[in-house]
Amino acid sequence: MKVILISGKAQNGKDTVAAYMREKLTEDRHRVLITHYADLLKYICRSYFGWNGVKDENGRKMLQYVGTDVIRKANPSLWVDFVALMLKYFHENWDYVIIPDCRFPHEVSTMRESGFDT
């Protein structure tokens, strides 16, 4: 399994690039997953804090507070460790995994240290 990490500024097309890559790779019959380090954060905010999924000013504040001020302060690598663990468990399900929200150097190094071809 190859892991493709995409980094860039907010609202600059990272998810669009990931979707295009998935389209082209699946045309060649590759199994492709797009996932985000922030998927677990969004799930937590929806399930535990009633977030409606809208990234308006209040939504962004909630995501930042829970993701950075609480979780990242307690465990800076929780988000990337969770994704790496899930990919280890289910590595046979995909040929490519695309992660379009890579922001920090440890997100790259954790994937490499976990043995993924990045």
Regions found by a protein language model. Give the residues of each.
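Surface-exposed amphipathic alpha-helices with a cationic face
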Residues: 88-91, 108-113
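Conserved phosphate-donor/acceptor-positioning beta-strand/loop module used by diverse small-molecule
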Residues: 96-103, 110-118
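ATP-dependent small-molecule kinase phosphotransfer cores
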Residues: 30-95
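Hydrophobic positions on the alpha1 helix immediately C-terminal to the Walker A/P-loop
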Residues: 17
